[in-house]
A protein has these predicted regions:
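Class II aminoacyl-tRNA synthetase catalytic cores and aaRS-like
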Residues: 1-505
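Compact, charge-rich alpha-helical regulatory domains located at protein termini
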Residues: 502-576
Length: 576
C-alpha cells in the first residue's frame, strides 16, 4: 500500500480498481442525457399530475444514509440538491445484489458523480425525492471533499478558510452553494448591461489586449516581449483609446467588456487583473451620460436583486434614479474638511490639498487633489455623481474642457458607499489640445510620475481626421458585483483571484532522519504523518508520538518493526 496517500485516498483508489474489475468504467465516455434538474423538479412537481414519472438527473453525491436494503443519498447538480431513494430490489431486478451491496454501498463515495433514472415522489415525511430505478457511475472522486455538516439550520466544520477557498475555488463552489450564487449574479449583471446597450443600438466590440502603447488611463502596465516581432508589448490598462478610434471610424456607439491589467497594489477592492466595461457614444456629452448611467444601474439592480434598495456594509444605498449629484466643492464643503476660498469651484479645487499632502516626486497638484478627494469622500452612504472640478492636464488628460470654465473638465465619477464605481467624460476631440496634454504627461513622467500616460501618436492622428462630440463611461464590473452581491472583498467576486504562490516546506532528506537514529524504513511513514523535517519532531510529546507511530503501522498493515519508547524519545530530543 502506497503510504504517500491518505487512508481515504488509498481506499478510493482501491474502489476505482474494483469498479473496473466488475466491468464498470468509472469515467465513461458516452454522454448522459439529463431531462430535469433538482430546481426544476422542486419548483414544478405536482403530486396530483405525476409530471415527473420518468426523469433522468445527474450530479454529485453529497451525503448518504445507508439502511440495509434501502438507502437515501443527496444529489447535487448545478441548480441545487435533491434527495434520492434507492432500493436493492429496484436496481437489482435479476436477483444479483452486486450493484447495490457492492457498487453503491461499498465502492461509491461522497463526491462521486452518478446519473439517476426514476420518478419523483414525496416520502412519508413529505420530502420531495427521486425514486431510483437505475443508476450510472459517471465519475469517481479519488480525493475526499471537506465534510460540512448541517443540523437544525446550523453549519458545523464549515469550509471558510479564505486562503484555501481562493486557491481551490472549484472546491469552494462544491461545498459552499452560496458562493455560486455570487457568480451567477455576476453573469446576470453583465447580461443585463449587454441587453441595455444592445437595445439602444450600440455594438459590442473587441480591441487588443497586447498593445504597443498602454493608453487610456494613468497606471503602471505589465510588460511582455513578442519574440516573432522582437518588440516589447504591454498588457492593456484600459480600452479607451481603441474604442474612440472606432468612433472616429464611424460607429455611433461601441462598448467592450474587457480584461485590464495594472501592475500596482492589491487590496480588498483592487486586483491586478480586473474586468471593466467601457462605452462610447457619439454626439453625447457627460450630462447625457449621467442619466444613461443612472438608467443602466437601476435596471441592473432590479434584474439582479429585484429591488433598487440595498444594504452595503450596514448602510442603506439606493440605485433608484436619479442619484444624488454634487460638485467636488460641494462634497468637500459637506465634509467640512478644508476652508474654501473664492466663489467659483475652480479656486477651491486648485487649493484643495493641504501642504503636507503635496506629492514631492513630481509636484503633481492634480494627483494630490485626487488622493485627498478620495479621503474626503470615503464613507459616503449614497450613490452620488460627482462633477470633479480637477486640474485639466494632470487629472483628466483625455477629457474635454468645461464649456463654462476652461480651468475645469466635463467629468463625473460615481461613488457608492465612499468607493468609486464609474468614471465618465465629455471626451476630448481637439487633436491639438490632446497632443499638448500628452506632452505634459511626458513631462510629468520625466519628473518621476510612473503612472503618467504615454504619448499615443496614432490616437492623435485619428483625432486629426475628426471625431464627433462623444461621451464615454467606464465601470468596474468586479466592484459593481461586490456592491450588488454584498461582498466586502474583490477576491469574493473573482473565480480565481491573484495570490502569492503556495508556500511549500521542503522535506528533509532521509539522511537527516537516520542521523538522529530513525530507521530508514520509518522515514516515509513519519513524513506521511506530516513531520517532513527533523525539526518538527522536536515539538512532539514522545509518548503520544510513539502511540501514533504504532497505530499508523497497525492500521495500514505496514509490518514494520516498532521502535521502543526510548528510541522515540531520542528522536524527539534536542541533538548535540
Amino acid at each position: 500500500m502506497a503510504i504517500e496517500l491518505s487512508e481515504q485516498e488509498q481506499l478510493r483508489r482501491q474502489s476505482l480498481k474494483a469498479l473496473r474489475d466488475l466491468g464498470i468504467e468509472p469515467y465513461p465516455a458516452a454522454r448522459y442525457e439529463v431531462t430535469a434538474t433538482a430546481r426544476e423538479i422542486a419548483e414544478n412537481y405536482d403530486d396530483t399530475k405525476h409530471n415527473y414519472d420518468d426523469v433522468r438527473i445527474a450530479g454529485r453525491i453529497m451525503s448518504r444514509r445507508i439502511m440495509g436494503s434501502a438507502s437515501f443519498f443527496e444529489l447535487q447538480d448545478h441548480t441545487g440538491r435533491i434527495q434520492v431513494y434507492i432500493r436493492r430490489d429496484d436496481i437489482c431486478p435479476e436477483g444479483d445484489p452486486t450493484l447495490y451491496n457492492t457498487v453503491f454501498k461499498k465502492l461509491l463515495d461522497i463526491g462521486d458523480f452518478v446519473g439517476v433514472e426514476g420518478f419523483a415522489f414525496r416520502t412519508n415525511t413529505g420530502e420531495l425525492s427521486v425514486h431510483c430505478k437505475r443508476f450510472t457511475v459517471l465519475s469517481k472522486s479519488i480525493r475526499p471533499l471537506p465534510v460540512v455538516k448541517e443540523k437544525d439550520g446550523k453549519t458545523f466544520d464549515a469550509f471558510t478558510d479564505p486562503e484555501i477557498r481562493y486557491r481551490q475555488r472549484y472546491l469552494d463552489l462544491i461545498v459552499n452553494p452560496q458562493v455560486k450564487e455570487v457568480f451567477v449574479k455576476r453573469a446576470k449583471i453583465m447580461a443585463t448591461m449587454r441587453e441595455f446597450f444592445n437595445s439602444k443600438g450600440y455594438i459590442e466590440v473587441e480591441t487588443p489586449i497586447l498593445q504597443p502603447i498602454p493608453g487610456g488611463a494613468s497606471a503602471r502596465p505589465f510588460i511582455t516581449h513578442h519574440n516573432s516581432l522582437d518588440i516589447d508589448l504591454y498588457l492593456r490598462i484600459a480600452t479607451e483609446l481603441y474604442l474612440k478610434k472606432l468612433i472616429v471610424g464611424g460607429f455611433d456607439g461601441v462598448y467592450e467588456f474587457g480584461k485590464n491589467f495594472r501592475n500596482e497594489g492589491m487590496d480588498r477592492t483592487h486586483n491586478p487583473e480586473f474586468t471593466c466595461m467601457e462605452i462610447y457614444v457619439a454626439y453625447k456629452d457627460y450630462r447625457w451620460m449621467m442619466e444613461f448611467t443612472e438608467q443602466m444601474l437601476e435596471r441592473v439592480s432590479m434584474a439582479v436583486n429585484g429591488t433598487t434598495e440595498l444594504e452595503i456594509d450596514g448602510r442603506k444605498v439606493s440605485f433608484k434614479a436619479p442619484f444624488r449629484r454634487l460638485t467636488m466643492t460641494d462634497a468637500i464643503r459637506e465634509k467640512d474638511r478644508i476652508r474654501h476660498h473664492g466663489p467659483d469651484g475652480g479656486a477651491a479645487a486648485r487649493g484643495l490639498q493641504a501642504p503636507e499632502r503635496r506629492d514631492r516626486r513630481h509636484d503633481g497638484q492634480g494627483q494630490t487633489d485626487r488622493r485627498h478627494l478620495r479621503t474626503v469622500l470615503r464613507g459616503g452612504a449614497h450613490p452620488a455623481h460627482l462633477r470633479l472640478r480637477l486640474p485639466i492636464i494632470e487629472m483628466s488628460p483625455l477629457c474635454k474642457r468645461h464649456r463654462d470654465n476652461q480651468d475645469l473638465t466635463e467629468r463625473f465619477e460615481l461613488f457608492v458607499n465612499g468607493k468609486e464605481l464609474c468614471n465618465a467624460y465629455s471626451e476630448l476631440n481637439d487633436p491639438i489640445d490632446q497632443l499638448e496634454r500628452f506632452q505634459e504627461q511626458l513631462r510629468l513622467s520625466e519628473k518621476g510620475d510612473d503612472e503618467a500616460m504615454f504619448i499615443d501618436m496614432d490616437f492623435v492622428r485619428a483625432l486629426e481626421y475628426g471625431m464627433p462630440t462623444c461621451s464615454g463611461m467606464g465601470i468596474g464590473i468586479d466592484r459593481l458585483t461586490m456592491f450588488l452581491t454584498g461582498q466586502s472583498s474583490i477576491q469574493d467576486v473573482l473565480f480565481f483571484p491573484q495570490m502569492r504562490p503556495e508556500k511549500k516546506v521542503v522535506a528533509d532528506p532521509v539522511e537527516a532522519y537516520t542521523a538522529i537514529g530513525v530507521p530508514e524504513e520509518w522515514v516515509p511513514v513519519i513524513q506521511k504523518m506530516g513531520y517532513i523535517t527533523v525539526e518538527s519532531l522536536r515539538k512532539l510529546a514522545p509518548g503520544k508520538f510513539f502511540n501514533d507511530l504504532c497505530g499508523f503501522n497497525k492500521k495500514n498493515k505496514l509490518g514494520l518493526k516498532a521502535p521502543s519508547i526510548d528510541e522515540v524519545k531520542a528522536w524527539c530530543s534536542e541533538q548535540e
